Amino acid sequence: MTKINIDILISLIPMLLVAFFVYEITPILVILSSVITAELAEVIFSFFIQKNRDSLKELSGITIGALTGFVLAPFTPLYVAAFAGAMATIFGKIIYRGTDKKIFNPVILGKLFVFTFFPAVLAPNSPAWTDAEGMRIASDNVSGLASLVLINRGIIGELSIAAMVIGAIYLIYRTKMTWHIPVSFFVTIFFGYYITSSNNVNVVTTLGEIIFMGIFVLTDTFTTPRHGLGKVFFGFLAGLSTIIFWFLGIQTEAIIYSVLILNPFTRPINTIFKPNVFGDEAVSFAEIIQGLGFAIIIVLLAFAVSYLHKFGFVPYIVYIYVVYGIWRLYNNR
C-alpha cells in the first residue's frame, strides 16, 4: 500500500508545479492545509485511539489530503481546505478502520463536506476560483492548443491537461492504474456531451475536471472494482449517471454524486465480473442480467438523488452520515 501511495504522490508533482506557475504559492498552501489535517486526523484517530500502528506507514493520510486539496478551488480558504482534508480521512477511511475496508471514496467525501458545510466557497461565482492579483498569466493569454498545456481556471488539479496525462502515463507505467475506468468514463462522458449539446443542456463541468476525476479519483484502489470488465462497467455507469445529473440540472455535484452512488456496488460488481479459475473474464448470460439489474438500480438512484438535491435534502443525508461516523468512531476505539 505504501508503494501505491508514493507513486500516486509522484504522479501529482506535474500538476503541483503547474499550480505554482499559474497561481504562485496559494494553491500549494491549500493542498498543504488539507494534507496536514488529513495526516493529523490519521495520527490522532488511527495511531492513538484505534492503536493501528501501521497506518502512518501507508502514507494514505497524506495521499487523501493531497488529492482532496487538488479537487478544491485554487483560492479556497485554508481553514476550508483543512476541514476537507480532515473530513475526508476521518469519514472516508478511519471510521472503517483501514484503507482496504472503506466503502466511499474519501476524496469525494471531502469535497461533498465542503459543499455541505461551506456551500458558498465552491459556488460558481465564488472568489475562491479566481484572483487576478494572484495570477501569473491572464485568461486572455491562454487559448487554442496552449490550453492543453496550461489553463487558469477550475480546480487545482485541472490546470494542465498535459500534466495530467504525464501523471497518468506514470501510474500506468508503474502498474498502479489501468486504462479501464478512465477510458470507459471518458467515452461515456464525451458521448453525453454530444447528447446534452444537441438538447441545449448547458454543461459547466470543465474538460480538465472530468479528466482529473477520471484519472486520479475514480481509480481509487479499494472503492472501485478489481477486474477489467468490472472496471469498464464502473466507468460506464459513472459516466451515465453523471449525464443523467446534467440533464436534471445538477452540474457541480454531478460527478461527486455519481461516484458516491457507485461506491457501495464495488463488491457486488467484483463478484459478478470476477475471472473464472482459468483467468478468463468472459461474462455469462446470467452475469449480464445481473449487470443490467445493477445498472437499472444505479440509474434509479441517480434520479432519486437528483430529487433529494432539488428539494435540499442532501445536506441532511450528510448530517446523518456524520452521526453514523461518530457512532462508528466510538465503537471502534
For the regions a protein language model found, what residue spans apply to each?
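Long hydrophobic alpha-helical segments that form multi-pass transmembrane helix bundles
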Residues: K101-I166
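Transmembrane alpha-helices
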Residues: E281-R333
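N-terminal signal-anchor module of multipass membrane proteins
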Residues: M1-F47, L308-I317
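Cytoplasmic-side transmembrane-helix entry/capping segments in multi-pass membrane proteins
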Residues: R53-I64, V80-A84, K101-K111, W179-V187, ...
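C-terminal ends of transmembrane helices
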Residues: L40-N52, T89-D100, I166-K176, I215-P225, ...
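Structural signature of hydrophobic alpha-helical transmembrane segments
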Residues: E24-T37, F75-A86, S147-I161, S198-I211
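Alpha-helical transmembrane segments in multi-pass membrane proteins
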Residues: D7-P14, V30-E42, S60-G65, G69, ...
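Alpha-helical transmembrane segments
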Residues: I172-F273
